Amino acid sequence: MKAVIQRVSKASVSVDGQVVSSIGNGLCVLIGIKRDDVAADVKYIVRKILNTKVFDDGKGKRWGASVADKKYEILCVSQFTLYHVLKGNKLDFHRAMPAQESEPFYMNFLAELRREYVPELVKDDAD
């Protein structure tokens, strides 16, 4: 699994011009799922998302607090393109997990993130 983590003051996901999910202060996380990812990868990436220190701690220390420390929101977006390979001028996604397998895997990831954090603070691209 790959997670691209971005600290945000607000973020949203729009589909056909309509906002389907949004957050205030927190993290926007793009999630890529590789063909051979397993449950242990989910636990690892959840731990990293929750504990990586990307916020000021309030005492003047930069990079001193995690999203869990601050009780901020998390917006997750499934992004299979994180596992692309550039072949000449063409993108190849053979390393990404196929859609029929990745959808339940992604839902399991969201369930684990909600279980380890505050469920109502975890949003996804379908909320």
Feature locations, PLM:
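Short glycine-enriched, charge-decorated loop/helix-capping segments at active-site entrances
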Residues: 91-96
